[in-house]
Amino acid sequence: MIDPTETYMNTLVPMVVEQTSRGERAYDIFSRLLKERIIFLNGPVHDGMSSLIVAQLLHLEAENPSKEISMYINSPGGVVTSGLSIYDTMQYIKPKVSTLVIGQAASMGSLLLTAGEAGMRFSLPNSRVMVHQPSGGYQGQATDIMIHAEETLKLKRRLNEIYVKHTGQDYDTIEKALERDNFMSPEQAKEFGLIDEIVENRSKADDAES
């Protein structure tokens, strides 16, 4: 069976060639955009992806701790602990992190979207956002299953608290909203507090940030 994450990672990446004083230099497109402090969070969230995103965030902080970072998100979600490592790093570093959903920000993707700097969380007009509670499956001894179930409930409460912090909604509202898969249009996501603005072009995004 083909691993969909391997298929995604093996997608052909365009190269960009630049003229420098030492001649031509080639970058893959993502490395070139990283020079502009742009990070792409595309595809399922897992340990491999989170380590790359965290490394990029820390690199950009070391390069310039006062200049903002832009994170473009198109993700169906994924492993909660992997996503939380990205979330914690976003809150830990000094630069402000602007987030923009392109396509979709679902599950853990929606949490990372709303974790951007207040006033700097954006959506393109045809994107969608989906929030829900964490899920998991376990097998083994009954006691171990009970332990894992209790841990999942603790994780659910912690995720709810993070949404409360960044959306301004009360805990009961968040818990109700995340009870099932809850798809939102950009307008609904803005009203709920997951994003700050819906942007159609770059000039509007720049105006919103200023």
From Swiss-Prot:
Record-annotated active site: S107, H132
Catalyses which reaction(s): Hydrolysis of proteins to small peptides in the presence of ATP and magnesium. alpha-casein is the usual test substrate. In the absence of ATP, only oligopeptides shorter than five residues are hydrolyzed (such as succinyl-Leu-Tyr-|-NHMec, and Leu-Tyr-Leu-|-Tyr-Trp, in which cleavage of the -Tyr-|-Leu- and -Tyr-|-Trp bonds also occurs)
Keyword rRNA processing appears in the UniProt entry: no
One cellular component (GO) term of this entry: endopeptidase Clp complex
Coiled-coil zones: none
One Pfam family cited in the UniProt record for this chain: CLP_protease
PROSITE patterns: CLP_PROTEASE_HIS (PS00382), CLP_PROTEASE_SER (PS00381)
Location(s), subcellular: Cytoplasm
Primary localization class, coarse: cytoplasm
GO MF, one annotated term: ATP-dependent peptidase activity
EC number(s) recorded for this UniProt protein: 3.4.21.92
Keyword line: Cytoplasm, Hydrolase, Protease, Serine protease
One GO biological process term: protein quality control for misfolded or incompletely synthesized proteins
Summary of the function given for this chain in its UniProt record: Cleaves peptides in various proteins in a process that requires ATP hydrolysis. Has a chymotrypsin-like activity. Plays a major role in the degradation of misfolded proteins.
Assembly and oligomerization: Fourteen ClpP subunits assemble into 2 heptameric rings which stack back to back to give a disk-like structure with a central cavity, resembling the structure of eukaryotic proteasomes.
Family to which this protein belongs: Belongs to the peptidase S14 family.
Official protein name in the record: ATP-dependent Clp protease proteolytic subunit
Species of origin: Ruegeria sp. (strain TM1040) (Silicibacter sp.)
Gene name as annotated: clpP
